[in-house]
Amino acid sequence: MAAKDVKFGSDARIKMLEGVNVLANAVKVTLGPKGRNVVLDKSFGAPTITKDGVSVAKEIELEDKFQNMGAQMVKEVASQANDAAGDGTTTATVLAQSIITEGLKAVAAGMNPMDLKRGIDKAVLAAVEELKTLSVPCADTKAIAQVGTISANSDENVGKLIAEAMDKVGRDGVITVEDGQGLQDELAVVEGMQFDRGYLSPYFINKQDTASVELDDPFILLVDKKVSNIREMLSVLEGVAKAGKPLVIIAEDVEGEALATLVVNTMRGIVKVAAVKAPGFGDRRKAMLQDIAILTAGTVISEEIGMELEKATLEELGRAKRIVITKENTTIIDGVGEAATIEARIAQIRQQIEESSSDYDKEKLQERVAKLAGGVAVIKVGATTEVEMKEKKARVEDALHATRAAVEEGVVAGGGVALVRAAAKLADLKGDNEDQTVGIRVALRAMESPLRQIVDNAGEEPSVVANRVREGEGNFGYNAATEVYGDMLEMGILDPTKVTRLALQFAASVAGLMITTECMITDAPKKDAPAMPDMGGMGGMGGMM
């Protein structure tokens, strides 16, 4: 077993604090509308330029192992804030640094670390309740746009695009961010249910200019197996031909004789048909076929429940106003399913989201909800260079997470004002003993640190602004972008309550652990083996005659 290096007490805490400061100082320069950029070197390609706190934190790895432990613990704060709310990473880091710095000063002055931690936890619990009372619902498009703008570092265009996307696909709709083709940001909305499976044969194409299949008022046959024998489908094909409607077949696969016969029928104009593979795999495919059935008021023909394709009737087929099939995607527009049944299905999937522990499963279930609820929006980010594209895309994703959080739990005054107001309300809070009360004071003082850092990054004097904001009431605060005091909500400077709450909770959680640390253990640095001794000089050859 390798030898260990062990540090105790203040020696350990000083080293840990040095690591915390290196990471936090690198991250906090990005906070606020006048926050600066950080340039990250890459082993290949151009460096990355970012104003995203968690991206900066993830890059930091220190040589000194004790300092590195401190840095990694604060990195955890930024990562947790990012995972839970998608934003607030820099705020969480600034709060953690402040609580740790003040807390370790109190420990050095002889306070009991465990009581300090209890005091900090007590203050944070009370502050969270206070934030909930300060919170205002984020209901209208204007408020959503403002939250998106603030989170995207005051980029109004991004805020407007996100608000427009939410307006079109609903609060539960899926909004994705992709690389755009031009210089402008664009929003593309896919109406109806879309899944990533295209036509099985190009001979089904009936719109040559767009290389797509477009069928109006079609029947939809949903089959949970491979179809290779045309005899199984004859009764359905005859019924559809008599009705004079087109048919879309969505099955695990359609191959061989069955596919060839469908192609021939289409080319001769006997019946308009298109075949598509069912989306997903395994159990997820079965669930998505069921979703399509509910959306189109059809039935999935499945041998598992004793149904046979040969006996399928027109009553078991789904219907939709229109279906568009391209090489890669199929879009079902205006399925005839009943609204109540679709709502019940959405509620059922939401229940599965609540119960699921896997992020991947949650994401896939959320996509299914969006497809049933009617739409997917794609924000295409435009930029001049690839470096700018990466930076901007990260900002748009942050803003998207922030707006979702705002819709979920409401908004509070931005610019660090909400935390200052919450701290002011708790000025008389006392602990069970003197040390706990000091812990409460440490947490309340730290709650001013985001406001001070925003002001500092804007080149103003933090103490002057903090005093002025403290004297004000309600949503009165300082707009660092315009250097104007006023009502933060009216100026459109909002932070999602969830983001502010989680930043404070995560920061206090990790800071509490660090304050109560008494010993740190790491691998001792390996001593280099002694170098090989020099070989004696080789004798030269004698002079040649």
Curated annotation (Swiss-Prot):
It holds the Pfam family Cpn60_TCP1. Gene3D superfamilies: GroEL, GroEL-like equatorial domain, TCP-1-like chaperonin intermediate domain. Transmembrane segments: none annotated. Keywords: ATP-binding, Chaperone, Cytoplasm, Isomerase, Nucleotide-binding. One of its GO terms (molecular function) is isomerase activity. Forms a cylinder of 14 subunits composed of two heptameric rings stacked back-to-back. Interacts with the co-chaperonin GroES. Belongs to the chaperonin (HSP60) family. It comes from the Bacteria. It is found in: Cytoplasm. This is Chaperonin GroEL. It comes from Tolumonas auensis (strain DSM 9187 / NBRC 110442 / TA 4). GO terms for biological process: protein refolding. CDD domains: GroEL (cd03344). It catalyses: ATP + H2O + a folded polypeptide = ADP + phosphate + an unfolded polypeptide. HAMAP family: CH60. GO terms for cellular component: cytoplasm. Together with its co-chaperonin GroES, plays an essential role in assisting protein folding. The GroEL-GroES system forms a nano-cage that allows encapsulation of the non-native substrate proteins and provides a physical environment optimized to promote and accelerate protein folding. ATP binds at residues 30-33, 51, 87-91, 415, 479-481, 495. Its EC number is 5.6.1.7.
